């Protein structure tokens, strides 16, 4: 399950790698903000087929987005949930443990990280 836009793009790339290297069936889902602190998952998860979930996002700053995503996922009978973050900024305000991190990058609160994932570029900018 990838958070809308970049998290979803990263999740699709991970799904391709998994499908190309392992003989397991995977499904891809997008999680996005519906209202403030309320998220939806599409397509909807099948409660009878929810076993192992990877929750993917591009940048972890405070942890607020991922905590609300986990809250939504826990509405289902999940057996195993792992988190994957491309860039961890180390400014957690919530007790979030990330299972897989691309890069730990200690930044100031005034600095901004922009992840660009499109057909021409796959870049991370710090400003």
Language model segments and positions:
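Structured catalytic core of nucleotide-sugar glycosyltransferases
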Residues: 7, 42-43, 56
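PRPP-dependent phosphoribosyltransferase catalytic core
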Residues: 70-127
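Glycine-/small-residue-rich active-site loops that bind phosphorylated ligands and cofactors
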Residues: 6-7, 61
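Short glycine-rich phosphate-binding loop at a beta-alpha junction
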Residues: 1-4
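Short, glycine/charge-rich flexible loops or terminal/linker lids adjacent to PRPP-binding catalytic cores
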Residues: 12-52, 64-67
């Amino acid at each position: 399950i990838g958070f809308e836009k970049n998290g979803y793009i990263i999740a699709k790339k991970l799904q391709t790698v998994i499908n190309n290297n392992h003989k397991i069936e995977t499904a891809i889902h997008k999680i996005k903000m519906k209202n403030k602190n309320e998220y939806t998952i599409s397509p909807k998860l099948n409660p009878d087929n929810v076993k192992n979930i990877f929750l993917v996002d591009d940048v972890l700053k405070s942890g607020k987005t991922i905590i609300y995503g986990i809250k939504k996922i826990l509405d289902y009978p999940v057996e195993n949930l792992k988190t994957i973050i491309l860039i961890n900024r180390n400014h957690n305000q919530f007790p979030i443990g990330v299972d897989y991190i691309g890069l730990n990058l200690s930044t100031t609160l005034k600095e901004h990280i922009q992840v660009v994932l499109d057909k021409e570029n796959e870049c991370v900018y710090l400003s």
